[in-house]
Swiss-Prot record:
Its cofactor is Zn(2+). InterPro entries: aa-tRNA-synth_Ia, Anticodon_Ile_BEm, Ile-tRNA-ligase, Ile-tRNA-ligase_type1, Ile-tRNA_ligase, M/V/L/I-tRNA-synth_anticd-bd, Rossmann-like_a/b/a_fold, tRNAsynth_Ia_anticodon-bd. L-isoleucyl-5'-AMP binds at residue 561. Its EC number is 6.1.1.5. A motif ('KMSKS' region) lies at residues 602-606. Keywords: Aminoacyl-tRNA synthetase, ATP-binding, Cytoplasm, Ligase, Metal-binding, Nucleotide-binding, Protein biosynthesis, Zinc. It is found in: Cytoplasm. Zn(2+) binds at residues 899, 902, 919, 922. It is an enzyme of class 6 (ligase). It comes from the Bacteria. This is Isoleucine--tRNA ligase. Catalyzes the attachment of isoleucine to tRNA(Ile). As IleRS can inadvertently accommodate and process structurally similar amino acids such as valine, to avoid such errors it has two additional distinct tRNA(Ile)-dependent editing activities. One activity is designated as 'pretransfer' editing and involves the hydrolysis of activated Val-AMP. The other activity is designated 'posttransfer' editing and involves deacylation of mischarged Val-tRNA(Ile).
Amino acid sequence: MTDYKDTLNLPQTDFPMRANLPEREPQTLARWQTLDLYRKIRKDREGQPKFILHDGPPYANGRAHLGTAFNKTLKDIVVKSKTLSGFDAPFVPGWDCHGLPIELNVEKKLGKDKLSANAFRQACRDYAFSQIELQRDDFQRLGVLGDWQHPYLTMDFGYEADTVRALAKIVANGHLLRGQKPVHWCAACGSALAEAEVEYRDKASPAVDVGFEAVDAEAVRQRFGVKNATTRVLVPIWTTTPWTLPANEAVSVHPELHYALVKSELQNQPVYLILAKDLVDSAMQRYGVDDYEVHGNLKGDALEGMQLQHPFLDRIVPIILGEHVTTEAGTGNVHTAPAHGLEDYFVAEKYNLPINNPVDARGRFIPDTFLVGGQPVFKANEPIIVLLADSGHLLHSETIQHSYPHCWRHKTPLIFRTTPQWFIGMNKNGLRERALAEIEKVTWLPAWGEARIGKMVADRPDWCISRQRLWGIPIPLFIHKKSGELHPKSPALMEKVAQLIEKESVDAWFDLDPKVLLGDDADHYEKVTDVLDVWFDSGVTHFCVLEKRRELKVPADIYLEGSDQHRGWFQSSLLTSLAIRDKAPYKSVLTYGFVVDSQGRKMSKSLGNVILPADVVKNLGADVLRLWAASMDYTVEVNVSDEILKRASDAYRRIRNTARFLLSNLYDFDPKKDKVAVDQLVALDRWAIFTTQKLQEKIITAYDRYRFPAIYQAIHNFCTVEMGSFYLDIIKDRLYTSKESGLPRRSAQTALYYIAEAFVRWIAPIISFTADEIWQFMPGDREPSVFLTQWFSDFPNAALSGEEEQRWQLLLQIRDEVNKALETYRNEGKIGSALAAEVVLYADERLNAAIATLGEELRFVLITSEASVLPFNEKSKAAFDTALPGLALEINVSEFEKCARCWQRRSSVGQIKEHADLCDRCVSNAFEDGEMRQFA
């Protein structure tokens, strides 16, 4: 048999079938760096409209985990898609560098006491730099393009100085408060914590009911209308923090709740109890009392001013009114310790009650505290409960499990503790109202983010921005020793401090002799040594980065972070921006869910479900990780597992194989010379170009709307359905067997060229390494990188009429039914391949109209050796109906010989003596002028 291989146009390309991403991606990365790709893009986009995605700074501690990898990948997809849309979209990465975690690591390594404060801060700075280098390598290895040589660091001298300037503007605008307020306090940190540093965990706590005895029982009884009685009156409170009882200054009741006087017997003694009417039954059940009488009914405001004896201190405390009292649990009477609770503090402030804080910075009672002096607060619960029991004031005690605030770093329970702190006042100068108004102007993605952050801002207390730590940006203020007032020239003095910090770091403030700035006035002022909350550091990036860097702008077009940042960076950025310039720092905010395993569990070493991005990159490649990130619905929790990553790897392989098919059939195609005019294109090729063009519109819209899973699905379907199992399958015959430079083949190549030009750009924001690798093998003159181009726009006008489009949709369905039938025949051993079959289609008028025009070329669409069409009502006995209404099929095994070149079974095989093993079509294609195709 003659070998006709040399007469065929078999696919050829150097683009590798095997991706080998772990080895190949670093080579691409090196090429980008040699090319200075990021700078080239900036130069290329100069003067174009800006699009700014502002990078929320990750903490400079530890390697990138899957959450940060997901974060940076989504950001990179956005930035690259905007670049392809023609925007100048610079990406300036940043790092959050101050704060406790770095202090703890340095302390563990070097010891805090062995170093001077300045040496300790330098050690923290060095440690942060080392962590940044690790993370920078991780992010670059993921293919994230950005200004990695010039990131912003919150510990850069310039940034530290600008943070002081931001604070100076906030001071000048009247938003700073100094107050002695209860704040979340971590004894292990020895410092206040911000709301965003608090996490809630289950904790076992003692829940106790404690009786406060009325000083004038007779007067109380009379208020309730009970006369001629001598029984004592108790006001029971319910609390899960018995350790706060030494700081009790009052008992709060709700002014509008109804309270009852309940007569009962407790501890073998008659007693009257004042309880919220709605809680009487549950309280008495708790006390194990079945027999009791309810006397009288008063609203809470009638109890105001009643005096009670503290259960174990020589202290008389009043009943006061508080809107925070509820009937959800307890007794309706709330133990009020202003030093240890924010609501307690606010209600006590109205009554001008003393605020005594008996707890030190390490969470221990000060030495002279009655009974529990020197003890850690949580250990003080037991002796207090024992004392209450011995004195007859303990009405009930049990242990409960409840959600309780913990330190995000130490995982230890927090306390509320009153200390002198600096606050941004939420109600000062209308900050809260303006924040709520600005939230409504921002686009929140998903939309529920607006309500979430709105509620948080509406409910939040003043923002405590001061911390008692070494490693941080100082609050460079001077306080008058007698009046406690800020120095009248504070903003101007802060600018001078900023100039010093710019040159010498934050040490300049801590080392500063006040006389340098204040002269003789220095003796009257005290220098503040607190540092700023790290959420303030990162919250002013809009001022220190967006406003300062020439290539950026404020407001940013988008902030993109995890949904936990509604209470973190989104909020701190919003509040500082409003306090500085009276508008939000962002136009839109996109949030995503936590990365969890396939069962919805958080990643943890103890569960053994931790997947490190470095391992994924090492084993599968960064592009597989990026494809996984794009495929996930980020509006909910994001699942990951080895199985999920394997699915992403399989999808990647399909995309790569599609690209390889395109490239391998364009090896001899020069777009300048070989492109076929649209009016000469084979109809199927025109359909393919039109389909590609339509899909591109959808893909670009999806990129603009940040609908990454929809893009993934569209590309996946394009590779597997429209292209893989339909168009590319059909045109193989034409590509391989038609005359090399004949119109049928060049028409198909023209379509493949347009598809490849569009396709490589679609995938570029997601699988960036692979897209740029494909780009190097594309035909024609081009830029050195796909990222120096825009979405492909040089499509011919291949628009189809609605009728034509409908016809091709029907053809897809018809071919699907034929394929199913042929597969059955194959499985039954009746045929080896589809080319061994001859198909008769019995079609109704609707379907007939779609396929009749194809005539002889229908067999190429169905990839059978013969295909004919007859009316549906002429079905033979051998025909069978399909799932497509109006279509029946009859399949016969061809009796003709197989062509040695195209493998079709045709009656013309053997008819031409010189080429007895070829069909007439192959003789024409191989040795004569070649066939013509009109439709397929």
